[in-house]
Amino acid sequence: MTASAPITQDVLTLPRKEPEGGKINLVGLTRDRMRAVLIENGTPEKQAKMRVGQIWQWIYQWGVRDFAEMTNLAKAYRAQLEETFEIRIPEVVSKQVSTDGTRKYLVRINGGHEVEVVYIPEDDRGTLCISSQVGCTLTCSFCHTGTQKLVRNLTPAEIIGQVMMARDDLEEWPTPGAPKDETRLLSNIVLMGMGEPLYNFDNVRDAMKIAMDPEGISLSRRRITLSTSGVVPEIARTAEEIGCLLAISFHATTNEVRDVLVPINRRWNIDELLQALADYPKVSNSERITFEYVMLDGVNDSDEDAHRLLDHIKRHNIPAKINLIPFNEWPGAPYKRSSNNRIRAFANIIYQAGYASPIRKTRGDDIMAACGQLKSATERARKSRKQIEAEAGVNNS
């Protein structure tokens, strides 16, 4: 790795060590892993697959956290489960509600770390923006989250637990046996919170497979969007192993500018990224790629930039939508938002070329919940590497 290259996800990714003698958390386990731990702890092997199906529905379809409420299981078996297992999700530390209805949650995970989660209600959908890491390695210069150093990856339980936490707050778990209601307050997930999802690929994949499981939360893969800054080797895996919609934090049309705005571009440049994006819809059956483009005054918002962006997309034959994002300023930000007239002119060039170019409506900026503004309280009390290693049970002496 060269000195100028962004650090990768393995710098502070440490093995997690559960406290000895503690209960096993069933949240975040794959079906196969849940079956294995049930067998290891006394469930007859012939019954294990059926038990997984029953417990899975109670946890992910009905939102039940107490084994005693799982009434299609024998009382003795429920007691056995209670002795060994738990159903634990991240703890809500605080909740802020914007004047536009946006909700920002600060949630605490293992080790006392905190991440932020945002729920955005709209007329036709409700979108939950979730985090995949504590902090971030990418140091994108326009992003507040990028000023917080990476602490660690989130586990599958901590990722899917954000979805479960939001459903708790929205009181959206259905009653067992009640008629199915297709109207959802939480209908979409976007992996656009803290962290780079593709630097935590395996855990993100496992969590999203739980979200998509038809016997649980049951979200269509068309209602899940993963946003990446351009971890090129993992884009193909995302198409094959998750198959969700893909958004790319593009933000610049030349390598010179993107190297500054999105430093991962020094590792995989624009041409390498565009080739990976061109292949994605063929594998995932996605209709199009979303290009996210933050509008920065005098930096990337010229007519020439708009035409270059179109040239990139057309040259690689990428089915695309371009989301233009007015820059959400934060204390100490080195950039200013492009004027409304400049944003509209840029959008019109894209639109006249035949591409959708919606201008994202800023949501939750009064509570620092808007795009690029997330930064948890963990930054104010960030722990040293030795403290993190000690929590993880790693001894490097």
Curated annotation (Swiss-Prot):
All copies of domain Radical SAM core, residue ranges: 122-366
Catalytic residues as annotated in Swiss-Prot or TrEMBL: E116, C371
Catalytic activity line of the entry: adenosine(2503) in 23S rRNA + 2 reduced [2Fe-2S]-[ferredoxin] + 2 S-adenosyl-L-methionine = 2-methyladenosine(2503) in 23S rRNA + 5'-deoxyadenosine + L-methionine + 2 oxidized [2Fe-2S]-[ferredoxin] + S-adenosyl-L-homocysteine; adenosine(37) in tRNA + 2 reduced [2Fe-2S]-[ferredoxin] + 2 S-adenosyl-L-methionine = 2-methyladenosine(37) in tRNA + 5'-deoxyadenosine + L-methionine + 2 oxidized [2Fe-2S]-[ferredoxin] + S-adenosyl-L-homocysteine
Location(s), subcellular: Cytoplasm
Gene field: rlmN
NCBIfam families cross-referenced by the UniProt entry: rRNA_mod_RlmN (TIGR00048)
Principal EC category: transferase
Record's keyword terms, sorted: 4Fe-4S, Cytoplasm, Disulfide bond, Iron, Iron-sulfur, Metal-binding, Methyltransferase, rRNA processing, S-adenosyl-L-methionine, Transferase, tRNA processing
Cofactor(s) it depends on: [4Fe-4S] cluster
Biological processes, Gene Ontology terms: rRNA base methylation; tRNA methylation
Record: residues binding S-adenosyl-L-methionine: G195, E196, S227, S249, F250, H251, N328
GO cellular component, one term: cytoplasm
Disulfide-bonded cysteines: C129-C371
EC number: 2.1.1.192
Main location: cytoplasm
Chain residues that bind [4Fe-4S] cluster: C136, C140, C143
Family of the protein in this entry: Belongs to the radical SAM superfamily. RlmN family.
Pfam families for the chain: Radical_SAM (PF04055), RlmN_N (PF21016)
Free-text comment on the cofactor: Binds 1 [4Fe-4S] cluster. The cluster is coordinated with 3 cysteines and an exchangeable S-adenosyl-L-methionine.
Coiled coil regions, renumbered to chain: none
GO molecular function: 4 iron, 4 sulfur cluster binding; metal ion binding; rRNA (adenine(2503)-C2-)-methyltransferase activity; rRNA binding; tRNA (adenine(37)-C2)-methyltransferase activity; tRNA binding
Protein name: Dual-specificity RNA methyltransferase RlmN
Note: Reaction proceeds by a ping-pong mechanism involving intermediate methylation of a conserved cysteine residue.
Entry function: Specifically methylates position 2 of adenine 2503 in 23S rRNA and position 2 of adenine 37 in tRNAs. m2A2503 modification seems to play a crucial role in the proofreading step occurring at the peptidyl transferase center and thus would serve to optimize ribosomal fidelity.
